[in-house]
Amino acid sequence: MEDKYIGLALAMSSSLAIGTSFIITKKGLMDASARTGGTDGVQASDYLQNPIWWGGMITMAIGEIANFAAYTFAPAILVTPLGALSVIIGAVLAAIFLKERLGTLGKMGCAICLMGSVIIILHAPPDKEVQTVDEILGYATQPGFMFYCTVVTLYSLFMIYKIVPKYGNTNPMIYLSICSSVGSISVMSIKAFGIALKLTLGGNNQFTHVSTYLFLIVVALCIVTQMNYFNKALDQFDTSIVNPLYYVTFTTFTLAASFILFKGFNTSSAVDIISLLIGFLIIFSGVYLLNISRSESPMVDRDREIFGVHTSKDMAPLDNGVGGFSTVRRSMQINRTSEYDNEESVGLRRFDSFEIDSGDEDTRNYRH
């Protein structure tokens, strides 16, 4: 069997495990929060003692190991987009176990994601032949990729120390942008270390090369950072928001990193390149439909898109990396529009509790 199809099977298995792990982890965090009364947040001692949370972590570890192996056998341009399958699995399981809504648009989104995945599978090129891990180090030390790594490092440090403490609990993209940008470097390092293992098992020992250990250190640092901020996002925001956004941002950053590292997608066929781009757009569209279909209402979606406000748990992030849950929604401040005036006249209410602040003396509070 060709390496490409081995990687494909591993990637699909990985998506199944990771999609399931999102739900198990969320259930564990919810259970830990319930045990603490749901008001003071989830401390590390709470969720680390929760067997459900550990079940989610173990399932995710299995999925990540399969994903690790998939990058060894197949190119990132094939493996990464197939993460859409984990979004589909997460959506279906969230509807069943977390009682999150999956309507007609959600089902259409799932079907569209599958269609885009098939297109990518059919047109993904094979990986470049690599004889030693030092060859990948040579790619990684080229100016283009070094510049990319520098930008990611500076951006992540700025977000972690300046933005997260103040605004981390207001928008999931703050956490997920860190996860995704750092994750793109981890994928390249995982691929390098995986190839080193593959070559070593084939009789060409790569553990005599310093670069093998260098890639391993980068993998460890990046994964710790990813998991920390992914846990924060998952704890404070709905899975229907976190999963799709994480997929889109992680895929985009990873494909950009792969393109820069290997100076292209290892294909000269215009048909393949165009088909791959179309496949990505189709998957992104499906993920978007899946996201909006599981929101509370069209009005909430509109306000979220306009003002960048998402439903979050009413608790700032804690130092241990996992914030708390609350039964009270965060009130959203939005500018008054004539549409709300019309809705007021017929007695409609779109939110359980929110404030409308026009910024002048005509400030009103709406309560359900």
Curated annotation (Swiss-Prot):
Span-the-membrane segments of this chain are 5-25, 51-71, 77-97, 102-122, 144-164, 176-196, 207-227, 241-261, 270-290
Query: According to the record, which residues are glycosylated?
Result: 266
What superkingdom does the record give? Eukaryota
GO molecular function ontology, one term from the record: magnesium ion transmembrane transporter activity
Q: Name one GO biological process term.
A: magnesium ion transport
A single Gene Ontology CC annotation of this entry is: early endosome
Q: Which reaction does it catalyse?
A: Mg(2+)(in) = Mg(2+)(out)
Classify the main location: membrane
Location in the cell reads:
Cell membrane; Early endosome
UniProt topology in membrane: Multi-pass membrane protein
Q: Which residues lie on this side of the membrane: Extracellular?
A: 1-4, 72-76, 123-143, 197-206, 262-269
What happens in the null mutant?
A: Leads to sensitivity to both calcofluor white and Congo red.
Any matching Pfam family: Mg_trans_NIPA
Give a short account of what the protein does.
Probably acts as a selective Mg(2+) transporter. Plays a role in cell wall integrity and in engulfment by host macrophages.
What's this protein's name? Probable magnesium transporter
